Amino acid sequence: MTIKEIAMKKAEMFKAENGDSYLIAVSDTRNTVAIHEIPVDVFPTLDIFTMTEKEKTVKLSIRAIKDWKKIIESFPKVATFDRKVIDNALEKGQTEKGKSKVNYGHALEHILFNTSFTEILASQSEVDGIYNGKKVQVKASLVTWNKTTGKNNSASIATVCEMNKALFE
């Protein structure tokens, strides 16, 4: 199985739930986060993925490296948020549900769709919510930020999916 095959399978699963596009969050400036919309049919064709194999599963990820960020930023920016808004939502979710359970993606879902952290963590759907009339999935782990130093934590990673290898046999 190739990175492209895994990305296509992920897109098929998302489209099966009538998913329209992915919302990918990236650091815009030190103080803002931009949300870029990538159509579901285009997303798996992009050269922005890495693959990690385990015994029974395969994981597809996006790294926040310069070239890949440029590709993501070439798609329409549909929203911009002050980083503090996302950090506050993250802190709220981690206080409610535990630090290891709530990430930037969950915080952004909470902001975009006004969904409770309980609902977000319980959901098994490919579709995270509806934004501008489209069914979307949010990926926001590319915005990690060290609040103490005021710097990016390094090339952060957003998991796109983790699938059982049996799906490709």
Regions found by a protein language model. Give the residues of each.
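Nucleic-acid endonuclease domains
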Residues: M1-E169
